[in-house]
Amino acid sequence: MTTDNSAPTASPWWSLPGKFLRREFLPVLTDLRLAIALLLIIALFSISGTVIEQGQSPAFYQSNYPEHPALFGFLTWKVIQVVGLDHVYRTWWFLSLLVLFGTSLTACTFTRQLPALKTAQRWKYYEEPRQFQKLALSAELDAGSVNSLSQILQNRRYKIFQEKDDILYARKGIVGRIGPIIVHIGIVTILLGSIWGAMTGFIAQEMVPSGETFQVKNIIDAGPLAAGQFPQDWSVRVNRFWIDYTPKGGIDQFYSDMSVLDNQGQEVDHKKIFVNQPLRYHGVTFYQTDWGISGVRVRLNKSPIFQLPMALLNTNGQGRIWGTWIPTKPDLSEGVSLLAKDLQGMVLIYDAQGKLVDTVRAGMSTQVNGVTLKVLDVVGSTGLQIKADPGIPIVYTGFGILMLGVVMSYFSHSQIWALQKGDRLYVGGKTNRAQVAFEQEVLDILERLNSQSATVINQQS
């Protein structure tokens, strides 16, 4: 009696996770349907991050996205803040989607694109006529030679491989096989730049009166690794803020003349900014986004000039207006209110009963409560949005790589084989794209080959 020892041995337990990853997880991860689904989900939430204002205060969302009635029947301020739609690009789930999408592309590159490239680089000569039958395009000629075909293919920029006079292999457009890999590298680079920017970038807002110097302090949104991006050893001075108005009184453009100062107060950069023309310094960008009125400079009788702060008043959506109050008696028992709606210098003066006393422009005086009130100037303030995104250079690099890969992918990888058997010439070829154009090219090559053969025969006769 003999014992059968051929039964398979059980695999060690530590190899099971690897087998699961290769057989179960990896095919799902590299599935094109998963990549498309992830791309659509990322695009959907990116659109939501564009439509829904990012980084605003809770009061803003409560005002613009009330519970009754809810936008689209479900979108309220509670949903926005619970899900994280007020800072989409820095939420853990959005970054996880980017990581998963990048991992899927990387796995696809190593399991499909790179093997396809290696396969394209491996080739063999066809030494039997029957091998040409499996090609998408083949022909059998009773005239012509491999050497004549080689010259024609060289003129068409094919790379020729020939070890014998009767066998030939030629190809061109191998770069088209590399293109998809470059596209994947570009997309992954863009994803890495987006993740790095979300982790290390920040957004701040400042409302700065004309003539003041400030450091970036009002951070409204920042990544967990953004502390190193905050400006520490330099500040910014708003030299002047002004608005150009149209002949009808509307705002044409608003400007800020700004200087960057070092720790010693020396100017190291200077620029006049306006909408779509920001100031950039050390990776931090200052955008002109808003404006306001910070104060009004006045004089009572022959007193020194002093500046009163002006506050934005609640008008229930009827436009913006700023106001302040100035006493006209030392015991503060009487005073008047000053109101302004723009920087054109018009100031409205109201008494304690809310009655309009006078309207003056900058530089004019008027009598109120027995004193001479002179309005010298209305001081504007510039509204700045300040951003730092260290991932932008990486994203731009990724887009450059992506565009290069797209261009490379347009090249067809075309292959041609030829075999001379006696007086018969076998020619065949295949391509990975643009099949019709390749067929036309092969027909032109065969026609050229026949014409050369006919010329040689005529010369011999």
Curated annotation (Swiss-Prot):
Q: Which UniProt keywords apply?
A: Cytochrome c-type biogenesis, Membrane, Thylakoid, Transmembrane, Transmembrane helix
Q: Which family does it belong to?
A: Belongs to the Ccs1/CcsB family.
Lineage, opening ranks: Bacteria, Bacillati, Cyanobacteriota, Cyanophyceae, Nostocales
Keyword Membrane listed: yes
Tell me the subunit arrangement. Answer: May interact with CcsA.
UniProt name for this protein: Cytochrome c biogenesis protein CcsB
Q: How does it sit in the membrane?
A: Multi-pass membrane protein
- Mark the transmembrane ranges: 32-52, 91-111, 178-198
* GO CC term (a single one): plasma membrane-derived thylakoid membrane
Q: What is any one GO biological process for this UniProt entry?
A: cytochrome complex assembly
Q: What is the organism of origin for this protein?
A: Nostoc sp. (strain PCC 7120 / SAG 25.82 / UTEX 2576)
The keyword Coiled coil belongs to this UniProt entry's keyword annotation: no
Q: Cross-referenced InterPro entries, in alphabetical order? A: Cyt_c_bgen_Ccs1/CcsB/ResB (IPR023494), ResB-like_domain (IPR007816)
What HAMAP family does the entry give?
CytC_Ccs1
Role according to the record:
Required during biogenesis of c-type cytochromes (cytochrome c6 and cytochrome f) at the step of heme attachment.
Q: Where in the cell is it found?
A: Cellular thylakoid membrane
**Chief localisation class:** membrane
